Amino acid sequence: VRDNQESTLNLPRNYGVDDFPVVIQSRAFDSNNQFVVNTADDHTMLINGTIDPILKVPAQIIRLRVLNGSTNRVYNIGFQGNHQFYQIASDGGLLDSPVALTRLMLAPGERAELLVNLSGLKDQNLDMFSFGSELPNGIYGAAVPGVMGMGSIDGYSANILNGKNFKLIRLSVADQTAQAVTTIPSKLVLIQKPDPNKSSGTRIITLSTSGMGMGNLSGPFLINGQTFSMDRINFSAKLGATEIWQISNHTAIAHPFHIHGLQFFITDIGDIER
């Protein structure tokens, strides 16, 4: 996130000094060291294209712009010793205020911006992990990919990452910089949420799969009974309208959901208000 609002905040933004991209991918390779796609054997972790990386960082607050670049794998991000960090932005931009966390679940294609306070950790290491052992069943990366043990994915159980905790990147903490950010802001931006009482209607969206019922974990997956097609417009809406989308997952595995070019606000999950 870089815009006029972000530029007024006291945040780390010196690229490569206190502001770092972290692109996370799990990959499989063939005998020629070429990527293998459409496989559950994605047991090699790459961070910014590097295996087992070490990132030199200053002993102050740093900013990590994290992207889950994996095809299927969900990461349950945290640091050793449950070191606290703060989420300040998501796919939708800056949050209204930092959120203190020890875990952050990140789905494929999802982004998050994090602040990590490394003050007082000079000459120490801090490792970022994915705590896969804590993922509930029904999420790709958990011990069991389907809810209630339904379905299977060829080669999934043999993957050494599934249901396990594993290191993503090591932060090697060095000297503080001359113009260090040393405090976490209490507020970020003012977010005006749309009024659901002024919506033009409710749109029903059902995620399902073809064949084998809910036990089919490999797809093809459907939205309202249809597979994706570049030649078809599934929905149309008036510019500037506010709609309520009611999304139901009728498969045995979790699916990330986002909309390109638009933002949305979650009102409730499973009838629990958010």
Where are these regions (language model features)?
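Histidine-centered copper-binding motifs that mark active-site loops
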Residues: 1-115, 134-136, 145-214
